[in-house]
Each structure stands twice: as C-alpha cells, then as structure tokens.
Amino acid sequence: YIKDDLRTSGDAVGVDAGLIWKYAQDSRLKPSLGLSIMNIGDLNFDRAGKIPQTVNVGVSINPTISMFRSLIVGLDYIDVFNNFKQDKDMAKRLRYGAELQLFDIWPVELALRAGMYESSPTLGADLRLLFITASYAMYTEEVGAYAGQDKIKRQLLTLNIGW
C-alpha cells in the first residue's frame, strides 16, 4: 500500500524587490551592482510548508571591445544568508558567466554564452535571422546535498517569432 503525501496544498502571495546600480561615470568597464530580495516576509503555505525569504547579490561589467557588439561578465551569489538551510555548500550558490554578442547587424544577430551554475558549466547561444530567433542552452541542475553529488543535465532549444 502506497500513500501519497504530496496532496497537501496551500496558497500564498509572494513579493520580490530588486535594485541595480550602474556606475554613472565614464568607465571602460561599465560596472553594475545588483541586489534582490525574494519572497519578502517568507511565503507561508500553511500545512504545505513555507518558502523562506532570500537575499541575492550580483556584480557585472560590460567593457567596450571594438571588435564585438558587446560583452557582459557577471557574478551572482544566491541566498546570501542561507535561509533555505539545505546545505552549507557555497559553490552551489555561486553563479558566474559571460555573454558575447558577436554582431547585431539587421537582419542577423549572434550571441554566445558560457558560465558556471551550481559548480557545473553552462553554454548557450542565440541566433536571430529576420523575425525568427533560435536559442540553445545547456546546464546542469544539482539535486544532491553538496556540489557534485547528484547532477541532472538539461538542454533547452527554443524558437521564437517576433518583431
């Protein structure tokens, strides 16, 4: 006899807030700092449990490189105060990466991305031709208690039509 314990449900309303500060002075690196607070005051689903408030911080640079359209390099630290208390592994909460937009000349645009998410590599690309954009992303999701324990590889392929 198997009993299903996943039948508990609940309702809650979440509120998030965030700030981005961009360095206003003329700078070759064009740095930015970010802060987000998610699930302000926690999300309480009564018997179904709660999702705690989290604070995230990030920093990025967007240097000018003459041979490319743009380059963005960023670093985020998720759940600064470890409110989820799932583990003490800082590597699972550190995310960093870069996006290189090779060109954006109508009707073609090409961007490449690479980084690290939960201590595993990520890759991605966007190709736009006229009004159609094809996007690919590959990343690994951590489901274990510490970085590297139990990983699931995921791939996404999307096709968008827009103008």
Predicted regions, residues:
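Outer-membrane beta-barrel porins/channels
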Residues: 1-163
